[in-house]
Amino acid sequence: YGYDYIELWGGRPHAYAPDLKAGDINEVRRLIEKYEMPVLGYTPEHNAYPYNYMIGSEAQRRDAIDYLKLSLEMAKEMGAEFVLTSPANGGYLATYDQLWSRLEKNIQELGDYAAKLEIKLVVEALTPYESNFFTRANDLVELFRRVDNPYVVGMCDIVPPFVQHESIMAYFDKLGNKMDHMHIIDGENGSDTHLIPGEGNIPIKEMLYEMKRIGYDKTATLELVTNYINEPRFYAKRAIDNMRELMAEAGIV
């Protein structure tokens, strides 16, 4: 379909980090070489089960951190530039002080390991349907105030700001050179559903025009997630075709 690169999701039976370590990484590298398609980033599943570093006992937190360290290692082996992490729901009894203390500890450790491997750790804010405390650009700003590490950077999935009536473009101003990646998809009010670009309510063409105006030159991927799992090839093709058309209309070649 003409992709420049892909962002690889990891969860069984699909690029799960322990399976990669057990030998599946060789198949991933074979496919990268066969199709001449680099893996830009690796996104291991850890928002709910069985891994979520924001909730549970210390043993459970440690297990999640070790899993993500392994994910960083596997990303490095496949030639990826980053691993994506998103702080999920921290439980309903935790205070903000407790949540922030736990998150700072987690990202500090993962960031130090990312720096050791010389691979970026990209942190993503989620929708309020997915996380009960890390959902806005300001949360990323606060995290970067607490964790000073050039290998820890941020991104914008454009659905979270849209469903919260937050400015998408504010991410660029607030994060500055820490604004390193984007998930560009469409969405609708009242839902965290990710839709094919041009088939929801987000003014993507106008957003692309503004991105061109400010000179955004980092990376972006189309994250369709679970809404189209019945026919992923059909909808992946439609998504990239729609995106090319929107980019052309915005004057991006």
Residue positions per predicted region:
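N-terminal pre-domain/capping segments
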Residues: 1-80, 108, 115, 149, ...
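Glycine/Thr-rich phosphate-binding loops of Rossmann-like dinucleotide-binding domains
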Residues: 16, 93, 131, 192, ...
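Histidine-acidic metal/acid-base catalytic patches
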Residues: 1-2, 26-29, 33, 79, ...
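Active-site acidic/histidine proton-transfer and metal-coordination neighborhood
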Residues: 51-153, 163-165, 253
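Short linear motifs at secondary-structure transitions and domain/linker junctions
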Residues: 13-14, 96-97, 129-130, 156-159, ...
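Hydrophobic faces of well-ordered beta-strands that scaffold small-molecule active sites
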Residues: 6-8, 39-44, 83-85, 121-123, ...
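Active-site-proximal loop/turn and secondary-structure-junction residues that shape catalytic pockets
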Residues: 10-12, 45-48, 88-91, 125-129, ...
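Short, flexible segments with low predicted structural confidence
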Residues: 3-4, 46-48, 85-86, 114, ...
